[in-house]
Regions:
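Long, His/Glu/Asp-enriched segments that create or flank divalent metal/ion-associated functional microenvironments
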Residues: 402, 469-551, 556-558
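Acidic/His/Gly-enriched intrinsically disordered linker/tail segments
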Residues: 332-402, 461-474
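N-terminal, polar/Ser/Thr-rich
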Residues: 19-51, 77, 141-147, 167
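Zinc-dependent metallopeptidase catalytic helix centered on the HExxH motif
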Residues: 249, 293-359
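Surface-exposed beta-strand/loop patches in extracellular or lumenal glycoproteins
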Residues: 55-74, 165, 173-180
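A surface-exposed beta-strand-loop module
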Residues: 73-140
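Hydrophobic helix-coil surface modules that form long, contiguous segments used
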Residues: 52, 151-155, 163-308, 337
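Amphipathic alpha-helical substructures
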Residues: 393-481, 541, 564
Length: 635
């Protein structure tokens, strides 16, 4: 049987995938598709409401008589046919509402194939919508002015504006934001101009490249900028902006390395906004304005790998976008790949392999937490009726990266050169500005294999890839990549000494001299070791006293220490005070969700007490997920 026939057979077996409709949207984007959005937003801090007016242009894919959009907690005021100026009939279809997805907005308007249909919608947001956080002045660094920011990923743009809230329907976006003086509005586009009125300022932005709605972003606060390169300005509150500019000074180096691996950066500007500590993630790759957590400010640039990751999304995710959240790994696996190419260039192969080892630790932990047979451990999970937040984990990042690394090794070992780099550059060229499914990615790779190797060798490689196991099967992949390196070997020696009860004299100096990834790897291996929950006093003191990990270290190390503390049920008054302080000042879910869960397994009442104290501090997404975690604990 020829290679082409085998490929055709494989494609037929999985062809249904390419026809899958995004299960995370109510919209009929496959019948009539949004192409651009003109948004006008008036920010009211007194009511915590945005009054919005959006003009959405649609392209009809077929004849029809209804446009269906996503909404969640929006009050629709009017829907107007922009061509005629007449009101259109509409309804919020509450009969089909889902807590996880919101309420479909049905607009009754006839259209014909290829027709351009402009619709104007006036509406208001809700003060309680999870896609927007409103911060009172006391929750900011300056303590004088309020602050707000959006988080539209994963399916929360429908809380900011009515739209086809799916990655499958990318849009050109123009934005105006009216805010009270002296506040500044930032957006995921290029700044164009501003108009000052008596008590307000209106800011105008334009995003010329098509983006999915989850990348639409707005932030308003008392903000200042520091230009650190020709294309990067760092924004933050005045009290934080200089520290942030110093921490992220190497940003353009990261961009240049990513450009060398792919092609030129297309977004014009790469700006960074340092958000308040309630921001729930390490970073969010909003185009032209990456959002980052203040927990990255370590003072020594040791945590800027997050910036490298968000920069990588400028190609992986933002230019070439997964069609649905089911293929999230196509965004995050490629972003991890580019991040580790940046790390290889900056720090060397050994550090990049160590980074990959840490990633595999994370992958292992999260697969075991879900259970090896759980659908969410697959790279193609079933998401019908699911809020993607509930399925979210690092599995698409690290399993996706490991899959791509596996493909890279197969291709380059056969080619005896870095052919994979050439193929990936072609991938980012072929699919830029578009959305992509797993099947389109697979087809592209298999076509490239035939192009460079011919049918026989291509068949051997594509068979060795084992697509089904990597993409569809839950749990661990059958192939485990080799990331062995000398840096982790040194860490392993100290882990053995610690667990054997040997002397750790001088380890504090060694630990301080290690690369940040070595420290993270060592602590990860300690936590993963079954003996770590039964440390003797002298062993535990290595962390609590010799290294003093609960004080003065960056958030990665402090978070790991508190995990070790709770594993050993060290819940004396002093330990709990340190933990409570950490939880009250950090809103990043990566760190605080596991700590609340670990504390609840020891003392659920105490965990709930701390959570209730911080209820007004945490982002709504964070609060919902922690409450869901704790609801599963009975003690």
């Amino acid at each position: 049987m020829s290679q082409r026939l085998l490929l055709i057979t494989a494609l037929l077996l999985t062809a249904f995938i390419s026809c899958e409709k995004d299960p995370s949207t109510f919209s009929n984007y496959d019948q009539i598709t949004q192409t651009s959005i003109e948004g006008n937003y008036k920010i009211d801090f007194n009511t915590s409401i945005i009054t919005g007016k959006v003009k959405i242009y649609f392209k009809a894919q077929m004849d029809g008589e209804v446009i269906i959009l996503d909404t969640n907690e929006l009050t629709i005021l009017s829907v107007i046919d922009s061509n005629t100026g007449y009101d259109l009939e509409w309804k919020l279809d509450t009969k089909h509402s889902l807590d996880s997805l919101g309420t479909p907005l049905k607009i009754y308007k006839e259209y014909t194939t290829n027709e351009t249909v402009p619709i104007l919608i006036n509406y208001q947001t809700s003060p309680t919508g999870a896609g927007i956080q409103w911060l009172k002045p006391e929750m900011t660094s300056g303590k004088i002015h309020p602050y707000m920011f959006t988080q539209c990923a994963f399916i929360y743009c429908r809380m900011l504006l009515p739209c086809q809230d799916t990655p499958s329907a990318k849009v050109i976006v123009s934005t105006s934001i009216t805010v009270p003086k002296p506040l500044v509005a930032l957006n995921s586009g290029i700044y164009k101009s501003s108009i000052e009125n008596a008590n307000t300022t209106t800011y105008f932005y334009y995003q010329r490249l098509p983006i999915p709605t989850y990348l639409i972003a707005i932030a308003v606060g008392n903000l200042e900028g520091r230009k650190i390169s020709e294309r990067t300005t760092v924004y933050a509150e005045p009290e934080e902006v200089d520290k942030a500019a110093l921490e992220f000074a190497d940003t353009d180096k990261f961009i240049q390395i990513a450009e060398a691996y792919t092609y030129g950066y297309e977004w014009g500007e790469y700006n960074i906004l340092l958000l308040p500590p309630s921001f729930p993630y390490g970073g969010m790759e909003n185009p032209c304005l990456t959002f980052v957590t203040p927990s990255l400010i370590a003072g020594d640039k040791s945590l800027v790998n997050t910036i490298a990751h968000e920069i990588s999304h400028s190609w992986a995710g933002n230019l070439v976008t997964m069609s649905t959240w089911t293929d999230f790994w196509l965004n995050e696996g490629f972003a991890m790949l580019l991040q580790r190419k940046i790390e290889t260039e900056l720090y060397g192969t050994e550090v990049a392999k160590l980074s990959s080892q840490i990633g595999y630790f994370t992958l292992t932990e999260q697969i075991l937490n879900f259970g090896e047979s759980h659908d969410y451990t697959s790279l193609h999970p079933y998401l019908v009726g699911v809020n993607f937040d509930d399925a979210f984990s690092d599995i698409p990042y690290e399993k996706g990266y490991n899959f791509l690394y596996h493909i890279e090794q197969l291709i380059n070992n056969e080619a005896k050169e870095d052919l994979f780099k050439i193929i990936i550059r072609a991938y980012f060229t072929e699919f830029k500005y578009k959305t992509i499914t797993y099947i389109a990615f697979r087809t592209f790779i298999e076509e490239q294999l035939i192009k460079y190797f011919g049918e026989t060798k291509a068949l051997n490689i594509t068979t060795a890839i084992n697509w089904k196991n990597w993409v569809f099967d839950p749990g661990f992949p059958e192939i485990k990549n080799d990331f062995s390196n000398s840096l982790s070997d040194e860490c392993d020696l100290y882990l053995t000494k610690l667990m054997n009860g040997d002397s750790m004299n001088g380890f504090d100096l060694v630990f301080k001299e290690w690369h940040e990834y070595q420290r993270e790897y060592f602590l990860s291996t300690v936590i993963a070791d079954p003996r770590s929950s039964m440390l003797k006093d002298e062993q535990y003191k290595v962390f609590s006293e010799v290294l003093s990990l609960g004080k003065g270290w960056n958030v990665n190390i402090s978070g790991a220490f508190f995990n070790i503390m709770l594993l050993n049920k060290k819940v004396d008054e002093e330990s709990l005070m340190m933990l409570e302080s950490f939880l009250a000042t950090n809103g990043r879910m990566k760190f605080i969700r596991p700590l609340y869960l670990a504390l609840a397994k020891i003392n659920k009442r105490k965990a709930m007490e701390i959570l209730n104290k911080n209820r007004n501090f945490y982002h709504p997404i964070t609060l919902r997920l922690i409450e869901a975690d704790l609801s599963k604990i009975i003690n």
